[in-house]
């Protein structure tokens, strides 16, 4: 069972079909995550921004089996995610496309997965007939920007860890 820590609005922004009312979109998003959690039995924590219109204090909810955290007024979800990966002994899989948060999580010993890759897992689990070999078909999936020593086909240690964690989701 994995502990998944999600940057809520970051992941919602990458998903298709979530235009319009913010609260209705958030409910549909949480319903999709709940279906995923039911299938995979992972512990999921979603952190939402309250920076511009939140409460005076940080609030926590438990809905549909998902732990939801709303940051307090003036605080970003990024700050809560950084605090959680720093303070907790649990190994998190952090889902975000925010490079700063991802690099902070990885430097703290956690795994960071881009939102786009997790979205594929989220939809694939609800549609098992989807093609599982998308990485083999995508010619740009494995790109290397620096010349490496050793086996040129072997992914970096961080990339192998990220791939292993993504495959386990």
Language-model segments: residues:
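Nuclease catalytic cores that cleave nucleic-acid phosphodiester bonds
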Residues: 2-5, 10-169
């Amino acid at each position: 069972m994995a502990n998944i820590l999600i940057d809520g609005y970051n992941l919602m922004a990458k998903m298709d079909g979530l235009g319009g009312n913010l609260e209705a979109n958030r409910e549909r998003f949480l319903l999709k995550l709940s279906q995923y959690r039911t299938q995979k039995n992972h512990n999921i924590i979603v952190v939402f921004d309250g920076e511009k219109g939140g409460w005076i204090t940080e609030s926590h909810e438990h809905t549909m089996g998902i732990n939801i955290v709303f940051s307090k007024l003036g605080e970003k979800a990024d700050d809560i995610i950084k605090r959680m990966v720093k303070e907790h002994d649990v190994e998190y899989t952090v889902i975000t496309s925010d490079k700063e948060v991802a690099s902070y999580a990885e430097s703290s010993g956690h795994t960071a997965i881009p939102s786009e890759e997790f979205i594929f897992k989220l939809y694939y689990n609800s549609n098992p007939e989807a093609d599982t070999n998308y990485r083999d078909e995508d010619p740009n999936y494995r790109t290397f920007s620096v010349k490496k020593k050793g086996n040129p086909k072997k992914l970096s240690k961080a990339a192998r860890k990220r791939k292993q964690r993504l495959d386990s989701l």
